[in-house]
């Protein structure tokens, strides 16, 4: 990622270190956990009744996290303790003036029956299917790209929505109590009624939380390299796995640095596509496709991922803290048009990288509450004016500012709609399937949230890389940062009694997986890129629907797709590469099965710098010119433009012949890297 672009400081303000604020009275961690048992139930997604004995939250003598050694696994005490999580919750409650009963409007509430399915169809671009309106061109194009499991997920949502509509319009049957009245017995209703209601609440609460993945199994996989297949849809892989064998009862815990296996994405003939390699027009199609695939995958895994409602937020009077990410970026674009991450977040991360990476306990040790509040006010007043100086900001204060910035966002960084989906990931028994669900969730996130999250995760990975100096293991970092990502605005979560430890560990595990596997998670799966190509190809052709039946139309589309591979045109022997700069003539490259994108880039570099020594009298001028051209050619990339893709930055290991067959009507263009 490019270095953060910070605002120039017009004047340097000296920040005199103030006296440390007197510590607040410590709150017993067991009491914090009980207070946290009021709001996290909304983060659990129902998939079945919980089973097995739940570990009780430690009431006394909680073990403190201690720095682990520079090598090897975390100790048993460290791997079983969540003390860092509850210490962070305690500090949040001490520093932020929380209102325990304030639920923030309707944020976190689950939609009513049928409403979730209606919203899902709108998010996936299939809202026209509601009410039997039929299929227009856009719906035809999208449905033609779906796999069988994805089509089944769409049909399932349509059926649920149709049933809810019929139920709403059905005339209710008259209750016999409306005719003859109700026998009133206060004593009976108070004794039996209350107990029955409590029993119903307990049973429904227990069914909301699926059995968590049990530890064990990963230690045997430690150090083993395993392939992470992105060529076929995850839901199709899960369906095949479900047919071949029974799902494993014991899960795989991701805790411990040594217990995380290494997953590698096999590079196919078309290469690997990262987030950012696709144009904005193509990338806008990915979230809806990823949402359909996520729903199909969760249907097969037996997870009910209900989308929560986004709460209403009041417009903040501040300019930095408590401001939506898109509003921050809108203001930042006036200063730096190319920025994709809020400048204040970049500045905070840059300050911590320069001053805090090697400091012991970074992110865990709190700063001065008085200084942090003063720094927040100075940032609000002086940041955009370029008058704020980071030179004397203590690294612990900067750490608190970073976490405070994340917590005070009007909506969670992981979004209010899909925060429950992130929280349910640890309940998936198989680690690879957890990664698949997380991968799709990352692709669904709005672009500002995804970019800000990536900047944060890159910084956290740098902290873990300096573990020998700062004594912060991957587990330490995850337990400290999890409350700031999952406790929106620092509010204690609601969850059933006895579930605190389970969900706290789950939240920290999600952060750990995102930090460790972020390169994999920020990849656009090959099957999604193929669906984008088909969607663009269908959009350009705009086939007319002759039969109104959905199944008939899908059958015809699949038949046409099978016939399309029989009439391939003759493959040219030479590929013409358009060059935007610095030459105008196209570059001719032999199109063979072994020609890679890297060969084109190497040939272009040799074309700019042929390596001739030249005459001695112009040696200095030629050497400077060749050096300049070599520097420029190092930033040259090959793009695929037109055809069934708008613009696609190609992987150097991709093969040209396979790219031509995937997009015969596209062009290849050499351009400078925009960054």
UniProtKB/Swiss-Prot annotation:
Marked site (Arginine finger) residue numbers: 364
A GO molecular-function annotation: GTPase activator activity
Gene Ontology CC annotation, any one: cytoplasm
InterPro entries assigned: Rho_GTPase_activation_prot, RhoGAP_dom
Bias (Acidic residues) ranges: 103-116
Any one of the GO BP annotations: signal transduction
Keywords in alphabetical order: GTPase activation
Rho-GAP domain residues: 323-522
Source organism, top-level taxon: Eukaryota
Location of region: Disordered: 95-118, 187-218
PANTHER family attached to this UniProt entry: RHO GTPASE ACTIVATING PROTEIN 18,19-RELATED (PTHR14963), RHO GTPASE-ACTIVATING PROTEIN 40 (PTHR14963:SF4)
Function statement: GTPase activator for the Rho-type GTPases by converting them to an inactive GDP-bound state.
Name under which the protein is recorded: Rho GTPase-activating protein 40
Organism: Homo sapiens (Human)
Gene designation per UniProt: ARHGAP40
């Amino acid at each position: 990622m490019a270095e953060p672009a910070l605002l120039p400081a017009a004047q340097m303000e000296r920040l005199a270190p103030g006296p440390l604020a007197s510590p607040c009275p410590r709150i017993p961690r067991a009491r914090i956990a009980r207070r946290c048992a009021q709001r996290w139930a909304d983060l659990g997604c129902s998939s079945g009744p919980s089973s097995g004995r739940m570990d009780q939250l430690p009431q006394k003598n909680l073990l403190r996290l201690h720095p682990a050694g520079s090598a090897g696994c975390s100790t048993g005490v460290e791997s079983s303790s969540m003390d860092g999580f509850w210490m962070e919750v305690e500090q949040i409650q001490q520093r932020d003036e929380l209102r325990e009963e304030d639920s923030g409007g309707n944020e976190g509430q689950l939609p009513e029956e049928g409403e979730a399915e209606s919203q899902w169809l709108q998010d996936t671009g299939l809202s026209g299917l509601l009410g039997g309106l039929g299929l227009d061109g856009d719906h035809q194009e999208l449905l033609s790209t779906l796999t069988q499991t994805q089509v089944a997920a769409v049909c399932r949502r349509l059926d649920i929505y149709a049933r809810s509509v019929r139920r709403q319009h059905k005339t209710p049957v008259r209750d016999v109590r409306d005719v003859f009245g109700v026998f009133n017995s206060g004593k009976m209703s108070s004794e039996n009624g209350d107990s029955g209601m409590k029993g119903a609440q307990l049973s429904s609460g227990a069914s909301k939380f699926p059995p968590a993945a049990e530890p064990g199994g990963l230690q045997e996989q430690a150090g083993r390299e395993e392939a992470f297949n992105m060529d076929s849809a995850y839901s199709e892989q899960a369906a095949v796995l479900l047919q071949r064998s029974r799902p494993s009862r014991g899960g795989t815990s991701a805790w411990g640095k040594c217990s995380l296996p290494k997953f590698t994405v096999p590079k196919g003939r078309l290469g690997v596509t990262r987030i950012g390699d696709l144009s904005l027009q193509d990338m806008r199609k990915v979230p809806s496709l990823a949402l359909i695939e996520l729903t199909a995958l969760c249907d097969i895994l037996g997870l009910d991922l209900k989308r929560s409602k986004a709460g209403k937020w009041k417009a903040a009077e501040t300019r930095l803290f408590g401001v939506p990410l898109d509003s921050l970026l809108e203001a930042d674009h006036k200063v730096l048009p190319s920025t994709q991450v809020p400048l204040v977040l970049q500045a905070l991360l840059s300050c911590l990288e320069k001053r805090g990476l090697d400091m012991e306990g970074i992110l865990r040790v709190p700063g001065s509450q008085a200084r942090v509040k003063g720094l927040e006010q100075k940032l609000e007043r002086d940041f955009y004016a370029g008058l704020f100086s980071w030179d004397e900001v203590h690294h612990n204060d900067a750490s608190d500012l970073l976490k405070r910035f994340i917590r005070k966002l009007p909506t969670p960084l992981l979004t209010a709609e899909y925060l429950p989906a992130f929280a349910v990931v640890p309940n998936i028994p198989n680690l690879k399937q957890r990664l698949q669900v997380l991968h799709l969730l990352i692709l669904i996130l709005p672009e500002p949230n995804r970019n800000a999250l990536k900047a944060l995760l890159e910084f956290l990975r740098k902290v873990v890389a300096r573990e020998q100096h700062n004594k912060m293991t991957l587990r330490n970092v995850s337990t400290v940062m999890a409350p700031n990502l999952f406790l929106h605005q620092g509010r204690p979560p609601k969850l059933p009694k006895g579930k605190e430890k389970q969900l706290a560990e789950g939240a920290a595990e999600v952060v750990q997986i995102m930090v460790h596997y972020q390169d994999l998670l920020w990849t656009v799966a090959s099957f999604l890129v193929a669906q984008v190509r088909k969607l663009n190809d269908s959009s350009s052709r705009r086939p007319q629907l002759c039969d109104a039946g959905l199944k008939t139309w899908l059958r015809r589309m699949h038949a046409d797709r099978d016939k399309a591979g029989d009439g391939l045109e003759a493959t040219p022997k030479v590929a013409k590469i358009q060059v935007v700069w610095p030459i105008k003539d196209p570059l001719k490259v032999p199109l063979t099965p072994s020609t890679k994108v890297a060969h084109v880039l190497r040939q272009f570099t040799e074309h700019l710098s042929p390596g001739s020594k030249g005459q001695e009298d112009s040696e200095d001028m030629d050497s400077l010119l060749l050096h300049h051209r070599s520097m420029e050619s190092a930033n040259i990339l090959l793009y695929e433009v037109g055809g069934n893709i708008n613009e696609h930055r190609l992987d150097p290991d991709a093969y040209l012949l396979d790219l031509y067959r995937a997009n015969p009507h596209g062009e290849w263009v050499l351009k400078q890297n925009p960054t």
